[in-house]
Amino acid sequence: MSEICPIAASSVPLYPPRVTPPPKPLHLPESFVKFLRNPLLTIPEAVYHEPLVVLRGPPAIVWVTDPALVKIVLVDQCDDFPQDPLLRRVLGGLFGNSILTSEGRDWRWQHQTVAPLFRHGEIVRYVPAMVAGAESAIKAWSAAPPGSSHAIDADMLRATYHVICNTLLPGGGAFIGETMKQGTSDYMEGISWSTAYAVLNLPVWLPRPGRRRMRFWETRLRAVVADTIRERHTSPDDHDDLFTRLLGAVDPETGRRMPEERLVDNLLTFLLAGHHTVAMTLTWTLYLLSRAPNWEARVLDEIRQVVASGPVTGEHIDRLVTVQQVLNESLRLYPPLPMMTRYTAKDVDLAGEHIKAGTLIGLPIYAIHRHHRLWDDPDRFDPSRFAPERKTGYSRYQFMPFGAGPRICIGAAFALVEATAMLATLIRAARFESLSVQEPIPVSRVVLRPKDGMPLQVTMRGRAGDDSLASGQP
C-alpha cells in the first residue's frame, strides 16, 4: 500500500484491511494449519453471505449468522445451546470457574453478585482514572521528538494497565500490572495451539508448543492475585475501589460472598479480558482515524465543543455522540472478541436443519459484522451507520462486539465508557498518521489484534509544524 494523501483520503471511501476468507470449506489438515495462523482464516466465504452454514467436517460445525437465529441460540433457547466446553478446557487453568467459564447455577450466582458493580452510575465514578490512563500515554509521546513513530498497540496496553491499577487494584496494582505484562504474551502465544487441540478433541496430555509456559503463568498469576486478596483482607486502610467492592459483593438472593478461589478466578478475568479488549479497540480506532481525517476532524470538533478545555468527566460521556459512533464502527469492523461458540445440549432444529446433540455451534462475530445481507457495503468504514437517527436500522443480534443475551460480557458498559473517555482524551491531545507501507493484519489471539503491531506517527497538537486539524478543520 502506498502512502495515502490525507486530503485525498478525506473524500475517498475507506476500506480498511480485512481477513480474506477461503472460497470453500477447508479440509482437516489445512484447517488445522490455518487455525494456528489465525482462526478467522477457517471461516469460509459462504458464512459472510448465508444465514446458516452447516459443515459436516471434520471438524463438524454449524455457523450461525442470521440475527433471528442468533437470538434463538443466545436468548430464546439458550439452555439448549450452553457454552462450549472447549472454552473451559482452554482457559479454565487460568480463569478457573469464573463468570466467563462457568455455567448454569454457578454462573448465575456469580453474575448476580458482580452485576451491581458494573451499572452505569458505578462506572462513571472511574472516568478520572480512565482519563489518567490516556494521559500516561500522552506524557510518553510528549517526551519523544515531534512526529515520532510509536507502537500504538503496546502503548494502549500500557495505558489500559494504568487504568486497571487505578480502578481495580490501587496500591498493589502496579506490581500485578508488571507481572501481567510479562505473562500475558507467553500465555496468549499458546492459546492457538491449545484451542486447536480442544477443537479436534485431542488428549490433554499430548505435548504441544507453549504448554509448559502456559502452565507456569497460570500458577504464577493465580498466586500473585491470591496474595493480593489476602493482603487486602488484612489491610486496615479504607479503600474505595472496584477491588474492595468485589470483595464485599454479595449474592442478592442468598447473601453469599465469593470465596477466595472464585475471587481469584474473577479478578484474573477482569484484569486480562478487560484491559486487552479496550486496548485493542483503541488501537484499531486510532488507526482508522489516521486513515479518515474527515472523521477525525468531526471527532475533534465535538470533543472541543463538549469537553472544552478541562478533562473528560462522567457528565461528558453520553454527549460524545460522534466519538461513540466512531468507536461502534471500529468495534463492528474489528470486534475485540471475534468469535463465540456454543454446543447443542440435545438434538435441535434450526432453520430447517436437524442438528444432533453435541454439535459445535459457531457464532462468528467478525463475519456477522461484515455480513453482506446485514450491512450495506460491509467492509467500508462508515461511522454514520451508528448515527442516533439510524439506531433502529440494525438488530442487536447483528452488532454484538461484546456478545448478547444473558451471557453478554458483564464489563461491556465499563469498556465502552473507558474507550470513550480515553479516545476523547487522546484525540484532543495528538494527531495520528499511518505511514507504513504494509496494512495491519487482523489476527485472532483471544482478542483481535494487529499481527505485527500498529506503528503510527504521533504528533502532539499545538506543536510547531502541526497545523493539520489544529482548529478541528480538515
Indicate residue ranges for each PLM-predicted region.
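Cytochrome P450 catalytic-core helices
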Residues: T277-E296, L300-E302, A413-R428
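N-terminal membrane-proximal hinge/A-helix region immediately C-terminal to the signal-anchor transmembrane segment
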Residues: S2-R105, W109, P128-S136, F175, ...
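Cytochrome P450 I-helix active-site segment
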Residues: Y15-P25, V127, V131, Q182-Y187, ...
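Cytochrome P450 heme-thiolate monooxygenase catalytic core
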Residues: P6-T20, P82-R88, E122-M280, R298
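Cytochrome P450 proximal C-terminal region
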Residues: S2-V12, L41, A134, I138, ...
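Conserved cytochrome P450 K-helix E-x-x-R motif and the immediately C-terminal K′/meander segment
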Residues: P29-V53, A223, D227, G310-A351
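Conserved cytochrome P450 K-helix/beta-meander segment immediately N-terminal to the heme-binding cysteine loop
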Residues: L363-K391
